[in-house]
UniProtKB/Swiss-Prot annotation:
Binds 1 [2Fe-2S] cluster per subunit. Binds 3 [4Fe-4S] clusters per subunit. Its cofactor is [2Fe-2S] cluster; [4Fe-4S] cluster. [2Fe-2S] cluster binds at residues 34, 45, 48, 67. This is NADH-quinone oxidoreductase subunit G. Its EC number is 7.1.1.-. NDH-1 shuttles electrons from NADH, via FMN and iron-sulfur (Fe-S) centers, to quinones in the respiratory chain. The immediate electron acceptor for the enzyme in this species is believed to be ubiquinone. Couples the redox reaction to proton translocation (for every two electrons transferred, four hydrogen ions are translocated across the cytoplasmic membrane), and thus conserves the redox energy in a proton gradient. GO terms for cellular component: membrane; oxidoreductase complex. The lineage of its organism: Bacteria, Pseudomonadati, Pseudomonadota, Gammaproteobacteria, Enterobacterales. [4Fe-4S] cluster 1 binds at residues 99, 103, 106, 112. [4Fe-4S] cluster 3 binds at residues 228, 231, 235, 263. It is an enzyme of class 7 (translocase).
């Protein structure tokens, strides 16, 4: 700690910080542009000037840039010194000489750091009356709009994109006051994290193009704290709504999880919530048609049918909340509840959970991954299956440069010096996968092989670290040399990290990862292990337990069950579509509860229209076992009284109560959570994921809307001039109104949107943190459900045999895509241009045997259908395998590991 003196007052601060960071952490306002908590200091904008004095007697002082000056013990500075204030105002005036005066038409207006800093410096009159320099804007793809004339040359965009996210296609061109930030030519930004430019840029150069189509100001949107639903990582988000539509998603700061950044799937993949073809009312089949029902009719009709059924089973979903899955389990009984996950995937999920809970190895939070100094990724294409983890791995690898700089006593915020000292030095990263990955550019070595051989590599590494681990026979000398290099790197690391998961389709890969972690722990290393699952609540469903999807289908096929309730699950993704359709056709009653229109609705007798994450509350559990609550953003029935979209748990509990002819006793979310805790002790921690509905601050609920929210009384005037009462939220501590507490200093960690007096942009998160870039002042939201066990597991001993290609037979290797493999986000219209067209990848040798080239269409039979796809040649794919894009149209993820036998060139 250090003692500094600011305008005559004494403060205790972190001596490792610079003065700007220290003052912001104290709640003092210093304007800045080029500095960012995640990017460090370069002193490019000169906006954060303060007056520094030699001692208490010095009255003259000198101007210094606070972002480039350490907060040393005994420092005396003044923020309010007149010369410093005039200098800061003049800097803004320089920047404004070329900045257009277009705030009324700029999409950044009301969410703009430049506006905030201009007001803060007091600059309110423009003296420059001459020609401004202008630029041509670029088309940067479907996600981001580009308006270069608004640029103030703060360099944040390229520092984030190139230095932090390792992007290669955005740069700066030109000189002096005529610089251009963009691509060498028009084209879609290639980085999976390009959307963060929207929040990194302090002006309106980079804005959210998906928001542009239905634009409104930040102060006119309704927000709620939420959790990204597009993968298992559980990033915190702030969805914004207007007129019953999601308009944009912003990053919600969580110092333990996603920090300041999201991936592009999480930021832009929300379009499925706004689809017009979503089920919005319950419907029941009458012959070949569906008739619309109200909620009471739906409940009575469903209950009447279920009463006549001899056995009802329920099929849950890894994309549904803990509460919804539990409500289904209560409806059908624990013994009749099935997870809706394929048997193989469920085995891998249970093993991953066992490793995390009983393995004796620490599981780091997402932010903690950045602190590891050697990383081994076994089997997961992390950028495609858990992209935010990949960004954290990139920071971990860069830790080598920070380590070298620290040895020379260079402060952690001196990023230019760190990059200069590091000269691209990296901590070791080793990656195994069936083919190339997006992390290969920073990897020390990549191993492209079938999953069996990847597992064998992992087992061999574990044995080399600890000879009591099972040995692997038949390792080639060249591969053994690589294993020795990996072992040396992992053994020499203070904090090695092992990353694996369920998406590779191999239980042995997970076992190998666990063995490597155990061997490293035995050598005294501070080792961590991270498991990546498939869906947002895969871990929660795994903890809850239940039979596999195949077991559920068997119940229907044999006639033991004659009614099935399917919860938020497109079963075609987890089993053969032919088998699913045949099994459902045998059931006299098929009830589907979902917020998306799926293929199995063709077999449904009753469809209950449920609410998406934006219209409901619930709890999900991420890949590290962290329970996190998401909250309802808006009530769709407020805009259309015909809409009947209830939370899935509310539908299912109402049905259960109707079936038993009793009063509904779960009238709010807290009642469901209490029931979960009582029945499933392993999930007891979810009660602490967020405060209950009685939480108040000074007697007030928390506001979902900014206090400047406008137009509320006119929003439904086209329907009726009589304004209805605002929706009443009985489930949570939030209110559907601007009338509630939204103070940044209030004792809360669930924050719907970032705003503080004088701070309207995302930089307002500074006001909610205990120190800038640290944790939220009153704790980061969410709670871990299990901690590292003391004992640990024994070594896994089932080493697989080497992969052997078979003539005339090909094994399907899984290829995942950030844009396209996820069930929900692939429905977003904006994603269509970013999704690759379905393909089949072949090794050059296999392509030669078949007599086909790149672009040739080949066909194969699967599930009673003939599939025809164009060939792509993959040099890294081992012969004897074919690669298919998992989750794309007609290519279910359950295909991973299956075999094809009739692959041939398609008839023209």
């Amino acid at each position: 700690m250090a003692t500094i003196h600011v305008d005559g007052k004494e403060y205790e601060v972190n001596g490792a910080d610079n003065l700007l960071e220290a003052c912001l952490s104290l709640g003092l306002d210093i304007p800045y542009f080029c500095w960012h908590p995640a990017l460090g200091s370069v002193g490019a904008c000169r906006q954060c000037a303060v007056k520094q004095y030699q001692n208490a007697e010095d009255t003259r002082g000198r101007l210094v840039m606070s972002c480039m000056t350490p907060a040393s013990d005994g420092t005396f500075i003044s923020i309010d010194d007149e010369e410093a204030k005039q200098f800061r105002e003049s800097v803004v005036e320089w920047l404004m000489t070329n900045h257009p005066h277009d705030c009324p038409v700029c999409e950044e207006g009301g969410n703009c750091h430049l506006q905030d800093m201009t007001v803060m410096t007091g600059h309110s009159f423009r003296r420059y009356r001459f020609t401004k320099r202008t630029h041509r804007n670029q088309d940067l793809g479907p996600f981001i709009s580009h308006e270069m004339n608004r640029c103030i040359a703060c360099y944040r965009c390229v520092r984030y994109y190139k230095d932090y996210a390792d992007g290669t296609d955005l740069g700066v061109y030109g000189a002096h006051d005529n610089v251009y930030f963009g691509r060498p030519e028009d084209g879609t930004l290639e980085s999976e994290f390009s959307g963060n430019l929207v929040e990194i840029c302090p002006t309106g150069v980079f804005t959210d193009k998906t928001h542009s189509e239905r634009y409104n100001r930040k102060w006119d949107m309704q927000f709620a704290p939420s959790i990204c639903q597009q993968c298992s990582i559980g990033c915190n988000i702030s969805p914004g709504e207007r007129y019953g539509e999601l308009r944009r998603i912003e990053n919600r700061y969580n110092g333990t999880v996603n920090h300041y950044f999201l991936c592009d799937r999480g930021r832009f993949g929300y379009g499925y919530v706004n689809l017009k073809d979503r089920p919005r009312q319950p419907v029941q089949r009458r012959g070949d048609d569906f008739i619309t029902l109200n909620a009471e009719q739906a409940m009575q009709g469903a209950a009447d049918i279920l009463r006549q059924s001899k056995k009802v089973i329920g099929i849950g979903s890894p994309r549904a909340s803990v509460e919804s899955n539990f409500a289904l389990r209560e409806l059908v009984g624990e013994e009749n509840f099935y997870t809706g996950i394929a048997h193989g995937e469920q085995e891998r999920l249970q093993l991953a959970l066992k490793v995390l809970r009983e393995g004796g190895i620490y599981t780091p939070a997402l932010r903690e991954i950045e602190s590891y100094d050697a990383v081994l990724v076994l089997g997961e294409d992390v950028t495609q299956t858990g992209a935010r983890v990949a960004l954290a791995v990139r920071q971990a690898v860069k830790g080598k440069a920070r380590e070298m700089a620290a040895a020379q006593k260079v402060a952690d915020w001196q990023i230019a010096a760190i990059l200069n000292i590091g000269q691209r030095a990296k901590h070791p990263l080793f990656v195994t996968n069936v083919d190339d990955t997006r992390l290969d550019d920073i990897a020390a070595w990549t191993y492209r092989a079938p999953v069996e051989d990847q597992a064998r590599l992992g087992f061999a590494i574990a044995h080399a670290l600890d000879n009591s681990a099972p040995a692997v026979d038949g390792i080639e000398p060249e591969l053994q040399n690589k294993i020795d290099v990996i072992v040396q790197a992992l053994a020499g690391a203070k904090k090695p990290l092992i990353i694996s998961g369920t998406n590779a389709g191999s239980i042995e890969v997970i076992q190998a990862a666990a063995n490597v972690a155990k061997a490293l722990k035995g050598r005294g290393a501070d080792v961590g292990i991270t498991m990546i699952a498939r869906s947002v609540n895969s871990m929660g469903l795994g903890i809850m337990g239940g039979g596999s999807l195949e077991e559920a289908l068997t119940e229907l096929e044999t006639g033991r069950a004659d009614a099935v309730v399917v919860l938020e699950n497109d079963l075609h993704r987890y089993a053969s579509a032919t088998r699913v359709n045949a099994a459902l056709a045998k059931a006299p009653l098929v009830m589907v509860v979902d917020h998306q229109r799926t293929a199995i609705m063709e077999n449904a007798h009753l469809v209950l229209s449920s609410a998406s994450f934006a219209e409901s509350d619930g709890t999900v559990i991420n890949n590290e076992g962290r329970a996190q609550r998401f909250f309802q953003v808006y009530d769709p029935a407020y805009y259309d009284s015909k809409t009947v979209m209830l939370e899935s748990w509310r539908w299912l509990h109402s049905l259960h109560s109707t079936l038993l002819s009793r009063e509904v006793d779960w009238t709010q979310l807290d009642h469901v959570i209490d029931a979960v805790v009582a029945k499933i002790p392993e999930l007891a921690g979810i009660k602490d994921a967020a405060p209950d509905a009685t939480f108040r601050i000074r007697g007030q609920k928390l506001a979902r809307e900014p206090h400047r929210y406008s137009g509320r009384t006119a929003m439904r005037a086209n329907i009726s001039v009589h304004e209805p009462r605002q929706p009443q939220d009985i489930d949570t501590m939030f209110t559907f109104s601007m009338e509630g507490n939204n103070q940044p200093t209030a004792h809360r960690s669930q924050v719907p949107f970032a705003w503080a007096p004088g701070w309207n942009s995302p930089q307002a998160w500074n006001k909610f943190q205990d120190e800038v870039g640290g944790k939220l002042r009153f704790g980061d939201p969410g709670v871990r459900l299990f901690e590292t066990s003391e004992n640990g597991l024994d070594y896994f001993t089932s080493v697989p045999a080497r992969f052997q290609p078979q003539d005339g037979k090909w094994r399907i290797a899984p290829y995942y895509h950030l844009f396209g493999s996820d069930e929900l986000s692939q429905r977003a219209p904006v994603f269509q241009s970013r999704m690759p067209q379905p393909y089949i990848k072949l090794n050059p040798a296999d392509a030669a045997k078949l007599g086909v080239n790149a672009g040739t269409r080949v066909s194969f039979s699967y599930d009673g259908n003939t599939v025809t796809l164009p060939v792509e040649i993959a040099e890294g794919l081992t012969a004897g395998q074919v690669g298919l894009p998992m989750g794309m149209s007609g290519i279910a993820p359950v295909l991973a590991g299956a075999h094809l036998e009739d692959l041939k060139e398609a008839q023209q």
